[in-house]
């Protein structure tokens, strides 16, 4: 998208990420997406308030606790989140609204589509439960939560980073007019990531894992199959330590252990994918510049494997670069297990923010975006990871093909 098109696209797009913030003055939150195009903060684009930012970030930070505390958990203080009401199982969804490569709808209508298309367990449609609707009410992370069956742990994340490009740019490039050295280094690091290659790497690994799951009826058989598949493909992951999250991911998946899920039988599971966008400068002990403009060394994938160590991801948002700014801490998109080979034709499901129909944010909307729409960044984020998790094959939350909107 070139600069001359940006205003038109931003003016017509709905709030498509689980993000919000204060409306800064012109240029305050502007960044560059690596193609010579200016990207703005989500706050500037969608005119959400500083209070919205604080509420969204607080709720996002409380979500992991909610995932273990159960549906009765409520975030403290200003949590105006509301669980969407139940929808009749046989009620058909209304058409989604198309908008520049994505389809948009309200959360209640998404529940109707989910029940018709994604709810099936062993071929039978299910009504979305109160607990699932509670998960969904958290916004972008809620969409991934309800489809994966667990709050996302992000342990098995992949990305692609061009080390040579990064070094060459630092050596031969120079800051732009008005750009500090810290801004320059953060921008070059961000531009050295390739989201499409990171996504493709996650797809490659998920494919290997799915082959290893076939005909493996215990974890030992699965791990043996996995190591053979990696060796046959000369994949660098074959050298991962036995304690690596790569090898423990399946056993740490709750649905793998559930009687109505995997029941400890790997052949009943399949590897699926979701994505997380977030900020690199999360280390509170690092310099203020890194917290504002990004930490070039943080969350880089391991050479060869593409694995990203997410253990230091604390859902901490970008620090303001000027008074009054606010940035949101993350965004999630659900991919599942689509077989479409062309990344640009894949569909990513995500939400704008938590469901607050009686608050200033308003009702949650759900979006089905093509990959280019999903991966196109905002200045709130400088990292995009593509994460593998597992769901039972008996679930239909990750079908081979996803059709945008309804019908």
UniProtKB/Swiss-Prot annotation:
The active site is at residues 140, 331, 350. Its EC number is 2.3.2.13. Sold under the name Activa TG by Ajinomoto. It has the ability to cross-link protein molecules present in food without the use of salt or binders. Used to improve some of the physical properties such as firmness, elasticity and moisture retention of food such as meat, poultry and seafood. One of its GO terms (molecular function) is protein-glutamine gamma-glutamyltransferase activity. It catalyses: L-glutaminyl-[protein] + L-lysyl-[protein] = [protein]-L-lysyl-N(6)-5-L-glutamyl-[protein] + NH4(+). Residues 62-98, 282-322 are annotated as: Disordered. This is Protein-glutamine gamma-glutamyltransferase. The lineage of its organism: Bacteria, Bacillati, Actinomycetota, Actinomycetes, Kitasatosporales.
